[in-house]
Structures are given as C-alpha cells and as structure tokens.
C-alpha cells in the first residue's frame, strides 16, 4: 500500500474517532465520511465501523469508492448514502447484509442495468431509492421496473409512483431516521421510522372513521387553575391607592413631572397646605394616569450601547415602546380630563404629540441612546402649534 493511501486511511479513522468523541461504541448512530479518496474499504475501516452496533446512518460521499468487497456488515443501518463514487452494478451484491435499509442513495455512480439492482436482494423495508446520474435511468420503462423490483418503494429519484415531486417528503423521511436518544443516552433506542409510519397510518384510518380515536403521541396534562379568594372592595380600593402612590413616587425618582409636595402629591395631613398641595397635582396624576417606566426609562437615559445592540436589545426596544406609551397616555389623559371626558380618543393622542415637546422631538427624528432614531414618517400626523 502506498504512503499516500496510508495517510488517507489514517484521515478516515481520525474522522470517525472525532465523530465518536467520548461516546461508547453502541452510542454512535451517525457517521459521515466526505471527500476522502480511500477507494475501497480497508480492514481497519471495516472493523472500526462494525463496532458501532447501533449505527443507523452512514454517509460516504465523493470518496471514489469502486470496490465494496470489504463493505462493513452493520445490520442496524437504515440509511446508506454512497453518492458521488464509482460503484458499478456488480458491486451491489455486497450491500445485501444491510437488509433493514429504508433509504439507499446511489446517485452519481456507474450502475448501468436494471438486472444489477437485483443483486441488492429483497430489501423489503426500502422506502426511498436514489439512482440519479446513473446510466440505468436511461433504460426504457425504468421507473416501473424499479418500483416492481422493490414493492415497498415509495420514492424513486425524489418522485413517487405518479411522478409527483416528493423532495420535501424525502427530506422528512431522512430526518425521521435520527434516533430519539441521540442526545439523551438514558433513553432506549427505538426505530423512529416505523413509529412515524405507524402514526401516519393511524391518522389516515381516522380520516374515514369518526368512531376511532387517533393515537396520541404525548398526553398533555390538564392544568387546573388555583382557587383565588376574591378580595373585598375596600381592600381593592386601598391597593389601588397604594399603586397610584407608588407610581407618583417613582415618577419623582426618575425625573418625571410630579407634584411639588414632598409626600409625592398625596394631600398633606396639615390643614393649612392640604388643598394647596393637592391642587398642584396634574390632572393625569389625580386620575391615576401616571405611568413611570422606572428601570426601562433609565436604560434610555443612560445611553449605553450594550442595551441597544447586545442580548438586551429586546429590553431596550420594550423600554422605548413603554416609554412612548407612557408619555402619550399621560399627556392624552391630561387633555381628556381638561375636556371633562372619561376616555381618551384619537384626537387626544394627536394633541398629545403636538403639545408635548419631548414627543414632538422624538417623532421628528431625535437621536436617542447614541444612534437609535425614528423615522419621520410616523403614523400620527404632526400638527404645528399655532401661534396665539
């Protein structure tokens, strides 16, 4: 054996060892060997692959394989991909040991005759076969002959028996071959493809019979909501007052407009300044329409780039939206209260943008947080304030 061939075999063995990692031999399910031109199976490669007793998917592409005499015997294989090699029809007999194959990819090889396919034996579980770019596809009545040769065959060269493209279905079949314990080694190995076919048949049968029950793969537990006692009306009113008080206090801490009194706008118990302090509250604060953003607004004022471009970007965007909503609702609430209305309508929102200098600047494209800016084409129209 030449030195170059010895190097290639070593590369193949190293590739297999790298894919195995720390897994045991019976925990290896997928092996891929790509573009390593080892031409035929050396005894070391054969013995290494045969140690994987749970191997289900074997891919050997573009390796110039022309001799399958020493092909590894792995009965657990359900998908074999030998695309872009130099395999001839007389070599197919050495694949007989893989009798549980369900997907066989032999595209871009040198298979010439339909008779050569008979060398594969009776693969009764074969669902998908790919022979594209082989001379055999030019045979008269090629598709019918191949479908008759393999009774269980569903997809030939990505087409079904009716010539309808089933490429997506072929991909789904390939994906279903991945064992369910590939990442959780504590689960037992199951034949995923058989379970998929079983579930599909059950669903198909139930389309015509309303009395049958479709087998459920997973039963979702019913969530029973916990019983919550209904609070009294007095406690609800007290909680509401506490929430309003907390909001007003937070507004003072983040620099929003708030009453001048030290107790956050709550009327003082001192008789002399009671009405004076209460009258200094804005109409929105009196009605509970104050929405301080707390931490989110501080994010905006800090102008830190990491909040805008890193993993906290979603928090930053939520802060922008919540901040805008708070500003608009507060200003629109003031306008509604001034007009002696209990609800905010679109006119009040439009006036809120017109009368609030900060919102007006934002809508006009004011730069915020070192680079974030808004489009001037905002949903709400901007009306210039008329001079009196």
Curated annotation (Swiss-Prot):
GO (cellular component) term, any one: nucleosome
SUPFAM superfamilies assigned to the protein according to its UniProt record, in alphabetical order: Histone-fold, L domain-like
Compartments it resides in: Nucleus; Chromosome
One Pfam short name: LRR_9
LRR repeats: 54-75, 76-96, 100-121
Domain LRRCT: 134-172
PANTHER family given in the database record: HISTONE H2A (PTHR23430)
Function text: Variant histone H2A which replaces conventional H2A in a subset of nucleosomes. Nucleosomes wrap and compact DNA into chromatin, limiting DNA accessibility to the cellular machineries which require DNA as a template. Histones thereby play a central role in transcription regulation, DNA repair, DNA replication and chromosomal stability. DNA accessibility is regulated via a complex set of post-translational modifications of histones, also called histone code, and nucleosome remodeling.
Protein name according to UniProt: Histone H2A.Y
Organism: Tetrahymena thermophila (strain SB210)
Organism taxonomic ancestry: Eukaryota, Sar, Alveolata, Ciliophora, Intramacronucleata
């Amino acid at each position: 054996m030449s030195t170059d061939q010895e190097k290639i075999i070593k590369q193949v063995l190293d590739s297999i060892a790298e894919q195995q990692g720390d897994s045991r031999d019976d925990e290896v399910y997928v092996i891929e060997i790509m573009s390593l031109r080892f031409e035929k199976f050396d005894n070391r490669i054969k013995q290494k692959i045969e140690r994987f007793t749970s191997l289900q998917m074997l891919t050997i592409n573009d390796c110039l394989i022309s001799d399958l005499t020493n092909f590894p015997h792995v009965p657990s294989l359900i998908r074999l991909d030998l695309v872009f090699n130099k395999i001839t029809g007389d070599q197919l007999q050495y694949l007989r040991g893989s009798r549980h194959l369900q997907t066989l990819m032999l595209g871009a090889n040198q298979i010439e005759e339909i008779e050569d396919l008979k060398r594969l034996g009776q693969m009764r579980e074969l669902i998908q076969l790919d022979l594209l770019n082989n001379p055999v596809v030019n045979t008269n009545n090629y598709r019918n002959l191949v479908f008759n040769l393999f009774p269980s065959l569903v997809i030939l060269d990505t087409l079904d028996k009716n010539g309808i493209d089933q490429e997506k279905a072929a991909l789904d079949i390939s994906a279903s071959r991945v064992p369910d314990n590939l990442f959780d080694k504590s689960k037992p190995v199951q034949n995923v493809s058989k379970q998929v076919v079983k579930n599909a048949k059950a669903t198909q049968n139930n389309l015509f019979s309303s009395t049958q029950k479709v087998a459920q793969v997973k039963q979702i537990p019913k969530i029973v909501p916990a019983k919550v006692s209904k609070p009294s009306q007095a406690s609800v009113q007290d909680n509401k007052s506490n929430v309003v008080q907390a909001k007003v206090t937070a507004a003072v801490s983040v620099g929003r407009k708030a009453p001048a009194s030290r107790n956050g706008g709550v009327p003082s118990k001192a008789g002399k300044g009671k009405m004076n302090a209460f009258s200094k509250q804005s109409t929105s604060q009196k009605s509970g329409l104050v929405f301080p953003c707390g931490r989110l607004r501080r994010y905006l004022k800090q102008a830190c780039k990491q909040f805008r471009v890193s993993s906290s970007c979603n928090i930053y965007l939520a802060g922008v939206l919540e901040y805008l909503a708070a500003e608009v609702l507060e200003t629109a609430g003031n306008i509604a209260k001034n007009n002696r209305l209990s609800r905010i309508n679109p006119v009040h929102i439009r006036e809120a943008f017109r009368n609030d200098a900060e919102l007006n600047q934002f809508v006009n494209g004011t730069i915020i947080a070192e680079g974030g800016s808004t489009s001037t084409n905002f949903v709400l129209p901007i009306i210039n304030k008329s001079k009196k």
